[in-house]
């Protein structure tokens, strides 16, 4: 069994490389997802993903679509590395003499991976959401100011233009949260993140493993890279849509600023109840299409890098098929 021991540094490097490539490719869609999910029954700014991206480019420029990307690019390496390496570790610990895992054990390994990753995922998402949603809130304030000016033209008192709110930075947000709420401020929404990421991993990893196994050659060699990519895309999109209701609740809970006439929430159940009462069941699927488009290539790329064993090649280590 010693010759099958997992090389943790290689898994961490593979996860980091995959995360950096994936985030760079799909981050604008993730921004659209966050803004669509945060829209309530107040001032609705966007009607679809494409409408959101077009309006973002017009009002904030091309790089506005990458607002918050620096946080993701910084923390996605440990986040994806922990997720993939933890799943590999738990699968290794649960296996017996190289025998194929049962579905229950595959789900158990995925559960462990999802639980481990929230250490990094929660503060990363907390900061990213504030930066991504700042543009939507600024656009709302601009529209409200314009409407106030138009209504003020017929009144005796002149309207006052709303002052521009400075855009927050990740460093400023981190400092303010630590000062006002301590480390718990960065982990707001931890429970909701667990309720999203643990079921996601329970669905994703067993589904990927079985889909990838279908493409394995009869000779017993590892699956071709394109099979790993397609398996990652299918498993990722399926798991993403399945847990999208929890992602909507998590996004709402982690948003510190609210738009015009938007609800505030005291916890997961309160948020879910208000969404259901005020917006209907369909609100839990807001951003599901965007999330599937984000997760599919993100995990497809991750599994290609992971299963090709790029880090093992760089480090001169033998490639071990998990």
Curated annotation (Swiss-Prot):
It catalyses: L-glutamate(in) + H(+)(in) = L-glutamate(out) + H(+)(out). The keyword Transmembrane applies. Signal peptide: none annotated. SUPFAM superfamilies: Mitochondrial carrier. Solcar repeats lie at residues 6-93, 101-214, 223-312. It comes from the Eukaryota. One of its GO terms (molecular function) is amino acid:proton symporter activity. Pfam families: Mito_carr. It is a multi-pass membrane protein. Keywords: Membrane, Mitochondrion, Mitochondrion inner membrane, Repeat, Symport, Transmembrane, Transmembrane helix, Transport. Belongs to the mitochondrial carrier (TC 2.A.29) family. This is Mitochondrial glutamate carrier 1. It comes from Bos taurus (Bovine).
């Amino acid at each position: 069994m010693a010759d099958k021991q997992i090389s943790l540094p290689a898994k961490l490097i593979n996860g980091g490389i995959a995360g950096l490539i994936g985030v760079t490719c799909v981050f604008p869609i993730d921004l659209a997802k966050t803004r669509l999910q945060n829209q309530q029954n107040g001032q609705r700014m966007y009607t679809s993903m494409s409408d959101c991206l077009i309006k973002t480019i017009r009002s904030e420029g091309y790089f506005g679509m990458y607002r918050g990307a620096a946080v993701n690019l910084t923390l996605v390496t440990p986040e994806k590395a922990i997720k993939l390496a933890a799943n590999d570790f738990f699968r290794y610990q649960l296996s017996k003499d190289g025998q194929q895992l049962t579905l229950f054990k595959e789900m158990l390994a995925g559960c462990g991976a999802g639980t481990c990753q929230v250490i990094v995922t929660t503060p990363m998402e907390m900061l990213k959401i504030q930066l991504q949603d700042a543009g939507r809130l600024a656009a709302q304030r601009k529209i409200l100011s314009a409407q106030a000016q138009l209504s003020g033209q017929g009144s005796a008192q002149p309207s006052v233009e709303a002052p521009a709110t400075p855009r927050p930075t990740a460093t400023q947000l981190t400092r303010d949260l630590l000062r006002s709420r301590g480390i718990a401020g960065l982990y707001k929404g931890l429970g909701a993140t667990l309720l999203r990421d643990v079921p996601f991993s329970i669905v994703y990893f067993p589904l990927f493993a079985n889909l990838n196994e279908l493409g394995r050659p009869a000779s017993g060699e590892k699956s071709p890279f394109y099979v790993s990519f397609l398996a990652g895309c299918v498993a990722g999109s399926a798991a993403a849509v399945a847990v999208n209701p929890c992602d909507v609740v998590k996004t709402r809970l982690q948003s510190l600023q609210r738009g015009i006439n938007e609800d505030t929430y005291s916890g997961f159940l309160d948020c879910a109840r208000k969404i259901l009462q005020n917006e209907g069941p369909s609100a839990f699927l807001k951003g599901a299409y965007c999330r599937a488009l984000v997760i599919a290539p993100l995990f497809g790329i991750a599994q290609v890098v992971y299963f090709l064993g790029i880090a093992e090649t760089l480090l001169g280590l033998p490639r071990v098929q998990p």
